[in-house]
Amino acid sequence: MSEVTVKALAEEVGTPIDRLLQQFSDAGISKKAEDNVSQTEKQSLLSHLQKEHGGESTDGTPTRLTLQRKTHSTLSVAGTGGKSKSVQVEVRKKRTFVKRSALEEEQRAADNAKQEAEETAQREAENVAKRKEDVRLAEEKAKRDEENKAKRNTEDTVKREATDKRKAEEKAKRTVAVKQAKSETELLQLRREEEAKRKAEEDSQRQLEEARKMAETNEKNWSATEQNVTANMEKSDYHVTTSTHARAAEDEQDRKEETTGTRRKKKPAAKKADDRKGRGGRNQRNQRGGRGKQKPQVNAPTSMQQGFDKTATVAKSDVVIGETIVVSELANKMAVKATEVIKAMMKMGAMVTINQVIDQETAALVAEEMGHKVIFRKENELEEALMSDRGETQAVESRAPVVTIMGHVDHGKTSTLDFIRKAHVASGEAGGITQHIGAYHVEIGNGMITFLDTPGHAAFTAMRARGAQATDIVVLVVAADDGVMPQTVEAIQHAKAAGVPLIVAVNKIDKDGANPDNVKNELAQYDIIPEEWGGENIFVHISAKQGTNIDGLLEAILLQSEILELTAVKEGMASGVVIESRIDKGRGPVATVLVQSGTLRKGDIVLCGLEHGRVRAMRDENGKDIESAGPSIPVEILGLSGVPAAGDEATVVRDDRKAREVALYRQGKFRDVKLARQQKSKLENMFSHMEAGEVAECNVVLKADVQGSIEAIADSLMKLSTDEVKVKVVGSGVGGITETDAVLAAASNAIILGFNVRADVPARRMIENENLDLRYYSVIYQLIDEVKAAMGGMLAPEFRQEIIGLAEVRDVFKSPKIGAIAGCMVTEGTIKRNNPIRVLRDNVVIYEGELESLRRFKDDTNEVKNGYECGIGVKNYNDVRVGDQIEVFEIIEIQRTLD
């Protein structure tokens, strides 16, 4: 074969020249489009392509085989509104098979033979099982057919008996009706026959009389006349007889048609006879064919009736309901329109919309009312699975006690703890009042104790209650000079509700007015009995200022903890409770967690209420970074997605993704439940709000440094609300005051309250531009007092009348311009010109008006004091008499307060 160029070879084999050059290059042959290609190079290229693409081997069989396959399918995906949509799915598969050696072929052949034998045996076994199953199914089908046949025969027998019975009853009724109609028809026919007979006899008598007269007058024509009379009689009798027989025949035919059985529609016999007979008693029904023909209405037997019977009830189904559900979703689950669900709820007394969220109980009542079976969905399956995968161990060890110090304001709680810790904590709190829950652990000679210092102010009830729930022992600090105070009683109630033992520390025994015995007597009224009186409570007399008997208090705490035998799981995944939380600028959300079991380590994944995250850093109460914390150790953790609520449970889990899902589920559940309750409260309070009318509102935007302070302040502000002024917290949050808070305050006409926080630069600029009211506080007393004052300014003022002067009329003069002028002597106070007056006669008010003129001698004056004479002109009143009294008063506006 002669050599050809690469370009000619490409045209010959029908491939692009670039691709052919690339194939030459892959085969190790460098060519250009104008170069010649020899036979050897062609053979080399062919060998390379066969090796590359699975060409034929030496025996002519291919060594590589590539298969491509496409499959198309349709997938139904559920959409909104209960509808589904179809999605086209294309699956592409590509497989390459390479020929193996002869040994592998033999092994594969043996394997294939073995596999075929196994498959054959399996198919035979399946066929045998299938035949057995077919036989069993055939027997069951035959049995069901026999049962159905017997059931149908029974039902047919019952139906036939019922049909025969109904036919017999209808036949009896028709027979009675026919007999009644027949008797009436025969009576009417007899009357008509008698009338016709009587008429015919009268006609014949008249004709005979005429014939006799004619015979007498004309004897010749007798024979002809007699014949005519006879013919007329026969003719008359013929017509009368014919009509009578015709009517009888027609009536007989009607009776036959009436008694043809159940095929003719049943009608009252009397009505049928009256409808069918017209003038002269003849049957007026059209018996001819054509469009006007009235066909008899025939009812088929009951067993032979056919027709479409619309199902009266919808198909009942099982409805799965979660914690909350939207009305439209509930309608989709029940396969009904949303309007039907809304109608059902309106009948039950609830007004809802199609997109409204309803709670589980309401949805269950609606579904059961509409005849469906309700299945309550277990919403927290993922949460339970996540909690069960924590791998907790059962090895428990003794742990340090968690002690909460409670008591009234300024009774020395923080000072006692301060002396124990050898640090001045109280000086760091604003006004010496504890605003947060301080958590500290103290190392002493015999072990370790964790202290929780709770605020004593009444506004921090929720924080104090959380402290009691997380503690093992409560130390109640009572001042020896003050005794039992309101917050002391509240702390006792929290300790009893939590079921924790109570140790009483009688503080300030170094003061002159200290009376520890009086404290014992007062506490005995609340079932706090000292041990020396036979009770269970330990009383320790201390002085936090001097440090007196502090060691005795610690020994009492350790003694009580030994009695309780406190244990916890030390190793394993940690769990605890959030004591406090806040947003730290630069570090983000910070939560103070008291570890209750396990060991919390840096890098653990924590699920904390509605928030989650990985522990990026851990700090102790002194601000030092630590790597781990065991049971009864309070720590600050960083890395959560948001600020958790104080009192939430903090749990370490394994999977970050599942923790995020559980947190999102909790947030959605919290939001749905909140919306459902909010809607319910709106409906319930709608009429009460309409009746109450307009009420002044004091809107507040509240920002604080920690979550507990927000709860305490918001609760205190809500308690300030009265019937005339309501306090409404339109926005609250942890952290500094931002521009968003300022915008919210401007939109709602609210004042901004910052508790231990400050506003940033954009927020201050916005506040200045909008002229908003921004106030900073560090002590809760001042905040509550100023809000109370602001609410007092919103109250409607009170007006009071105050008498400033009294004048007695001594004489009356007449003036042409003014009228009656009263000459008076001022007996009390001062008479002023521009004030309103009252005229009293015998101590009874007879007129109320104003002064028109006030003169002393001839000069006008503005006021006349006690003991002087004056002339008074009363405007629009001339009936002034001697002896009357003129009382001058003024209206004073008094600003009301909430106290």
From Swiss-Prot:
GO terms for cellular component: cytosol. Residues 398-565 form the tr-type G domain. Keywords: Cytoplasm, GTP-binding, Initiation factor, Nucleotide-binding, Protein biosynthesis. GO terms for molecular function: GTP binding; GTPase activity; guanosine tetraphosphate binding; translation initiation factor activity. Residues 36-47, 73-87, 296-308 have a biased composition (Polar residues). InterPro entries: DNA-bd_dom_put_sf (IPR009061), EF-G-like_DII (IPR053905), EFTu-like_2 (IPR004161), IF2_assoc_dom_bac (IPR013575), IF2_II (IPR044145), IF2_N (IPR006847), P-loop_NTPase (IPR027417), Small_GTP-bd (IPR005225). Residues 31-227, 240-310 are annotated as: Disordered. Residues 453-456 are annotated as: G3. Residues 101-173, 181-219, 247-261 have a biased composition (Basic and acidic residues). It comes from the Bacteria. Pfam families: EF-G_D2, GTP_EFTU, GTP_EFTU_D2, IF-2, IF2_assoc, IF2_N. GTP binds at residues 407-414, 453-457, 507-510. Residues 432-436 are annotated as: G2. Residues 407-414 are annotated as: G1. One of the essential components for the initiation of protein synthesis. Protects formylmethionyl-tRNA from spontaneous hydrolysis and promotes its binding to the 30S ribosomal subunits. Also involved in the hydrolysis of GTP during the formation of the 70S ribosomal complex. This is Translation initiation factor IF-2. It comes from Photobacterium profundum (strain SS9). The gene is infB.
